[in-house]
Amino acid sequence: MKAADEPAYLTVGTDVSAKYRGAFCEAKIKTVKRLVKVKVLLKQDNTTQLVQDDQVKGPLRVGAIVETRTSDGSFQEAIISKLTDASWYTVVFDDGDERTLRRTSLCLKGERHFAESETLDQLPLTNPEHFGTPVIAKKTNRGRRSSLPVTEDEKEEESSEEEDEDKRRLNDELLGKVVSVVSATERTEWYPALVISPSCNDDITVKKDQCLVRSFIDSKFYSIARKDIKEVDILNLPESELSTKPGLQKASIFLKTRVVPDNWKMDISEILESSSSDDEDGPAEENDEEKEKEAKKTEEEVPEEELDPEERDNFLQQLYKFMEDRGTPINKPPVLGYKDLNLFKLFRLVYHQGGCDNIDSGAVWKQIYMDLGIPILNSAASYNVKTAYRKYLYGFEEYCRSANIQFRTVHHHEPKVKEEKKDLEESMEEALKLDQEMPLTEVKSEPEENIDSNSESEREEIELKSPRGRRRIARDVNSIKKEIEEEKTEDKLKDNDTENKDVDDDYETAEKKENELLLGRKNTPKQKEKKIKKQEDSDKDSDEEEEKSQEREETESKCDSEGEEDEEDMEPCLTGTKVKVKYGRGKTQKIYEASIKSTEIDDGEVLYLVHYYGWNVRYDEWVKADRIIWPLDKGGPKKKQKKKAKNKEDSEKDEKRDEERQKSKRGRPPLKSTLSSNMPYGLSKTANSEGKSDSCSSDSETEDALEKNLINEELSLKDELEKNENLNDDKLDEENPKISAHILKENDRTQMQPLETLKLEVGENEQIVQIFGNKMEKTEEVKKEAEKSPKGKGRRSKTKDLSLEIIKISSFGQNEAGSEPHIEAHSLELSSLDNKNFSSATEDEIDQCVKEKKLKRKILGQSSPEKKIRIENGMEMTNTVSQERTSDCIGSEGMKNLNFEQHFERENEGMPSLIAESNQCIQQLTSERFDSPAEETVNIPLKEDEDAMPLIGPETLVCHEVDLDDLDEKDKTSIEDVAVESSESNSLVSIPPALPPVVQHNFSVASPLTLSQDESRSVKSESDITIEVDSIAEESQEGLCERESANGFETNVASGTCSIIVQERESREKGQKRPSDGNSGLMAKKQKRTPKRTSAAAKNEKNGTGQSSDSEDLPVLDNSSKCTPVKHLNVSKPQKLARSPARISPHIKDGEKDKHREKHPNSSPRTYKWSFQLNELDNMNSTERISFLQEKLQEIRKYYMSLKSEVATIDRRRKRLKKKDREVSHAGASMSSASSDTGMSPSSSSPPQNVLAVECR
């Protein structure tokens, strides 16, 4: 994309437009791997030379006169005729995404870089591979030569020159010889080097009187005048001289053994870093060995030696080092036809055809392309594979040929490379002979390809049967070896058979392949492999029946919950699968390459989200299974699913065994870290105190199915231990399926019906009261139960059940104890989360927590629940907010949870390590609650948050304010709240001594004492560190707009206040000061713009405003116009958070609020995007004020439109779900309207619709 006036290369920090998925996006250059090739015209002898920019002194500009270093080391004057920027630029897009690109994919910001005539949206989805309209129509000449017009005469000269050069490079008698090169600087000095073909390196011009050599000392390539070269008979040099002269030792080893020196090879780890795909090649290669062994059984003739991963690594090490030394490093995994290109295999296939120069026909190249196993997407296949070969391997082929370097599996039993130097007719004959042989070698050499393996192996078998008399004699010895090896593999198979009768051969070989995949390149000793196999087989044995029965049930049960679980299961199996998809109807129907991004079940039918290769993601679509053509080795999703499920189950069985062993030792099963990271998902659903889970008739099927699964499972697991436990678990069993079924439903609906919830809760609490006495036992049983839950469902259900049970226990006494149970529920949740991430050791801590929670329950139990609704003054929201939020949270929690979970579920899975850190934190916090009454600890157990950042120190209190100015921001998903919250948790707040000893479920505000200013400041500094983390997490959220990511505080749905935010950070810095009473009401600004929002907004705002009921919101509104910034110190934003039912204790008196205010009399203002100071407006005259406000409105409107589109997509999904839940939602709707009319506190009426309202409306 370089224009004439652009610099030769770009520097770090340059703003550019970079190509990303076919479109140009704003980006900044982060790092540069600089490599500028300069073509210069030497004034002295009028010849051209290609040098790198470090060989040139002077300005890098076409036409500039510079000094350039010539091959003999001297500097000559020259004119730059062409500059090529071959640098690699790592750019960072504004969303934090990074890409490493060449200069051709970048252009300086502000350049016109698209054809204005059309947008990508108008392009038809007809043929993604022939994407005919270029994004920019500027670059016409795509050839590698300079774009200056070339005259016919010049062309002829060039071609004749090339022919001469070819002859010269083939006939040079020095090729492959070790020579001594006289050093250019000191004439007395010399170094050993290997003479190689000049065509190895296009960038170095080698004149007629020069040779290209590779030094044994630094492995670099040099063109050296022939007069400076002397042939050396290294083999006859005395040992003393060999050891003294650097490089001589290496040269002599090379001559004797043809082993290249280490400095001519790249470390394999570097190769794996630069091309992560090579990682997969290793295992795939061993995988293929298995296939080959099977092929050998069916086809005794195959005498080829086993494919050699070591040799392949050896090849890659030399190739990568060669490419780097000649200035063309392979920085990214080479790709051909959307598949990783296996360079070793390509090299071998071309070698068998007589080398690149001897392949004249496109058909041969096409055959090579097919043999690589890459599907042919278009007519350019043969051209593409040829150019890929020329780019990556041609120079290396020339180098190997001239240096006589060979690779076992490439040249094995084949005519030696030297023979390729015969004249053309001979090598063509050779190619024909080899042609017949090629398929054979191919069976052997499939290091990467298993994609079209079925069709390919058929083809191979046919060809294998062709007579091959001539060659067989030469390979007799080899075939004997082969037979021995076959016998070994057969023995191995027999062993496995005896151990595992149920499992058929196919399955077993699949298992072996899995092992090999695991073992990868490590070349694990055979015994170890066998051991692993045996273990797996014995596990398999016991599980086989279980799996079968379960699979049957999975297919039978069509319940929503089941469907969803299936979908969960399928996703890991199918995601990323490359498939073909039929597009269009009738005559116009075409088939496209695509990959499956995710799967979903709709009315019992599986839908797949596919991404068409070569197409913008806007063309991704949901398709039914009948439009998908599965690859042969997949045979549809089912097979693969089952295989994966089986492997998963094997590993789970192992875990279970371990656990049982430990149970017997400690009397309690440690929850292993293998609990899936989906845990928060299950937990959050139930963790909210009010909206626990609603029972609806449609769920009964689900219950039955789940219970059936449980029963089957128990029968099949014959351990007595478990049988005994089953009795204890009966009650839990009954409850479990209900809850998990509901949870699943809730996932789908993203709605909760408080009415149902309350009913259910009452019922549950009765049951729980019975259970509660032996709570510890129950927790253990729950854990066991979780482990028993049906394996077929993958780990999801396991975690769900566990969390449900825990929550169930935690919900005990909710009715009796007012807000207190929330605390417990939450901490239990924490502990279960912890379990998820830690091994059994942490469990002790968890148990401690649980016990402490019991104590706490007793303390808190005394406070009456009526206090929840008590609000003296809606406008006094300030300090007490954190306490007041609790009650509101209770109501709103349920809905928020849902939102969160949906968004965070995935992230949680990605970030177990962070969760782990935070969990540890949480544990400390929970115990600190009790130990340090003088401190306020913030315990933010939101799993979501934890994902985004490590938890903040125990003394930090979350201070959360939100800008309600932009109501539309409410629509943003609660995700941002999480991020914001975490960033805001930096502000630490002190609590008045008058506070009753209420432990907040989240922040464990256990202290009646006030922290001193100094303390709060020091704590603040600790917690501030996290701000950066949070903002990053926030940016990464799907739903975020640019605006939001820039300004984390804007979008907080549950924001308690309009412009409190304004002072948010400053107050932090200034030691948490408090604004005067008058301001406090402003938080509620614009709170009630739409009726639907009233409850959500009220809820959210009230979380900050002192639990005012809806009726009290009206006075609050009056102040809203003033919009003076207010700071509230104890606002702890967690209410949004999915999990925390009782964030804040409701028992706070107005007097205390006033005390707070006195303590912190003032806080300085801080301006954010859509919040501003009144004095700012006062300073303007009326017209300025109007234009200013109009600008603000305009921004808000833009923002609103972006949210609107998001809402549309969510609505579409909801419509599908609504069909199923119409009756339930009616009940919920009436409930919500009642609550808004009567002014009930949101704690008792959280309308289900708001789940989404909060998220996006």
Swiss-Prot record:
Residue ranges, compositional bias (Basic and acidic residues): 290-300, 416-436, 485-501, 549-561, 647-662, 705-749, 775-790, 1063-1076
UniProt entry keywords in alphabetical sequence: Chromatin regulator, Differentiation, DNA-binding, Isopeptide bond, Nucleus, Phosphoprotein, Spermatogenesis, Transcription, Transcription regulation, Ubl conjugation
Biased composition (Acidic residues): 151-165, 276-289, 301-310, 538-548, 562-571
Phosphoserine modification, residue list: S676, S716, S864, S1109, S1145
Assigned GO CC terms: nucleoplasm; nucleus; plasma membrane; Sin3-type complex; transcription repressor complex
Domain of life: Eukaryota
Chain residue ranges for the region called Retinoblastoma protein binding: 951-964
Short name of any one Pfam family annotated for the protein: Tudor-knot
Domain called ARID: residue spans: 309-401
Ranges where the record places region Disordered: 141-168, 271-310, 412-469, 485-579, 632-750, 775-800, 873-893, 1063-1167, 1212-1257
Domain topic, free-text comment: The function of the Tudor-knot domain, also named chromodomain-like, is uncertain. One study suggests that it mediates binding to lysine-methylated histone tails, with strongest affinity for H4K20me3 and H3K36me3. However, another study failed to find any interaction between this domain and histone H4K20me3 peptide.
Ranges annotated as biased composition (Low complexity): 1226-1248
Intracellular or extracellular location(s): Nucleus
Signal peptide: none
Domain Tudor-knot: residue ranges: 576-628
GO BP annotations listed: erythrocyte development; establishment of Sertoli cell barrier; genomic imprinting; negative regulation of cell migration; negative regulation of DNA-templated transcription; negative regulation of stem cell population maintenance; negative regulation of transcription by RNA polymerase II; negative regulation of transforming growth factor beta receptor signaling pathway
Native organism: Homo sapiens
PROSITE patterns reported in the protein's UniProt record: ARID
Subunit record text: Identified in mSin3A corepressor complexes together with SIN3A, SIN3B, RBBP4, RBBP7, SAP30, BRMS1, HDAC1 and HDAC2. Interacts with BRMS1. Interacts with RB1. Interacts with ARID4B. Interacts with AR.
Function recorded in the entry: DNA-binding protein which modulates activity of several transcription factors including RB1 (retinoblastoma-associated protein) and AR (androgen receptor). May function as part of an mSin3A repressor complex. Has no intrinsic transcriptional activity. Plays a role in the regulation of epigenetic modifications at the PWS/AS imprinting center near the SNRPN promoter, where it might function as part of a complex with RB1 and ARID4B.
Parts forming coiled coils: none
Extent of Basic residues compositional bias: 523-533, 637-646
PANTHER family, alphabetized: AT-RICH INTERACTIVE DOMAIN-CONTAINING PROTEIN 4A, RBP-RELATED
Region annotation (DNA-binding) ranges: 4-121
GO molecular function, one term: transcription cis-regulatory region binding
Protein name per the record: AT-rich interactive domain-containing protein 4A
Crosslinked residue numbers (Glycyl lysine isopeptide (Lys-Gly) (interchain with G-Cter in SUMO2)): K481, K513, K718, K738, K759
